C-alpha cells in the first residue's frame, strides 16, 4: 500500500528526533569533519548539480516563473563556489554547543551559570533558492540540531542533488543520515504535517513569500522564527556625503533585486533632494530600475506616481519607490509605519542624527552609511544564516549558530542544603 503523506512525514519526524540525540552530543571535530566532507562532495559533483538545476530552471521558465524568482533558483558556478565556501566557513566557526557563561557564586555557596544547548529538531520551509539547503543544513549540523528541509517544488531536482552531497559528508563523519533530511514529496500536505508535529519538531523556520509565512505563522503548532517582508529603506539626510549616498543607495537596490535586504524605498531629505535626486535617478534609469515617486519627487525627476500601496510593497524587482521627507523625524515615522522591521539605513555625517535614527527605528538591523544588502549572516560574521527574524523573542536579525541554540541553567554545589546558611 502507498504510504500517505502524513505517515511519510511522521517517519521523517521520528527519525529526526532520534538523530537529534546523536548530533546533539557529537564532538566539534566530528561535526566539522561532516561539513568539510560535504564541501568536498559538492565540489566533486558540480556537473550533477548543474544538470539538476537546469531541469528546475527549464521547468520554471516553462511555467512562467518571474525573472527575480528564476534568479533565486539558479545555481551558477559562483553560487556553487559560495556554497562550498559557506560549508568550510561554518566548519571554521566556534561551536556554541556546551559553552558556559556567567558562572557566579550565590550567597548559599552554589554556582549558577548558563550553558548553550541545541534546540533539537528544526523544520525549514523555503521557496526557490536551493542554496538555502546548504545554509540550513550546515548551521543546523554545526549547532547540534537535526533538520527536516522542505524546499519548493520548483527546486526539487536541485535540492535532491545537494542533499546527496550532504548525506555523503554525514556518512564520512559517522553521523546518521537523518541528521539532515530533505522532504522528497512536492505534495503541499507535507508542509501542514511538518508544522503540526510538536512531538518531533521544536521550531519551524519559513523562508519565502508573504503568503507562505503568514500561513505557517497562523497554522503552526510549534514556535516559528520568521520575517514577513523585507521592506528596507535608506534615508539620505541633509548631512549626507552625496557621493557616498549615490553609491550606497545604488548598491542597496541593484546588488540583487530578489533578496530581502534589497532597498525598496528611498527617503530623501528635502534640503538635499534637488541636488541628490537627478544624479541618483540617472544611475537607476541607466540600470533599468523603474522609479515611483511622491509629488515632491516628481517635481524634481521623472517618475511614475507612487501610491499608498507602494510604501507597503516588497518589490523583489527592479522597482524603487522614492519619497522626499521634511527631515529625520518624518523619515523615522515613515519607516516605523510602513517598514517591515527588517533593515534600514541612514546616510549621514552627523553623529547625533545617526544615533537618533539607530535608537528610534524599530528594525532588526539599523545601519549608518551602509547598503541594506549587508543584512546577511556571512557579512555579520555569523557564517551562513538560517534566516532573518523580525520578531523580538528568542532571535532577532540574521539567525546564525547561536540563534539555533538555547540556554539552560547550570548549577554546581558541594552538598549545600536549602534553608541553611545565609539564604
Swiss-Prot record:
The keyword Cytoplasm applies. The keyword Heme does not apply. Its main location: cytoplasm. Pathway: Amino-acid biosynthesis; L-proline biosynthesis; L-glutamate 5-semialdehyde from L-glutamate: step 2/2. InterPro entries: Ald_DH/histidinol_DH, Ald_DH_C, Ald_DH_N, Aldehyde_DH_dom, G-glutamylP_reductase_CS, Glu-5-SA_DH, GPR_dom. Catalyzes the NADPH-dependent reduction of L-glutamate 5-phosphate into L-glutamate 5-semialdehyde and phosphate. The product spontaneously undergoes cyclization to form 1-pyrroline-5-carboxylate. Signal peptide: none annotated. Keywords: Amino-acid biosynthesis, Cytoplasm, NADP, Oxidoreductase, Proline biosynthesis. Its EC number is 1.2.1.41. PROSITE patterns: PROA. One of its GO terms (biological process) is L-proline biosynthetic process. It catalyses: L-glutamate 5-semialdehyde + phosphate + NADP(+) = L-glutamyl 5-phosphate + NADPH + H(+). GO terms for cellular component: cytoplasm. It holds the Pfam family Aldedh. One of its GO terms (molecular function) is glutamate-5-semialdehyde dehydrogenase activity. Belongs to the gamma-glutamyl phosphate reductase family. This is Gamma-glutamyl phosphate reductase. It is found in: Cytoplasm. It comes from the Bacteria.
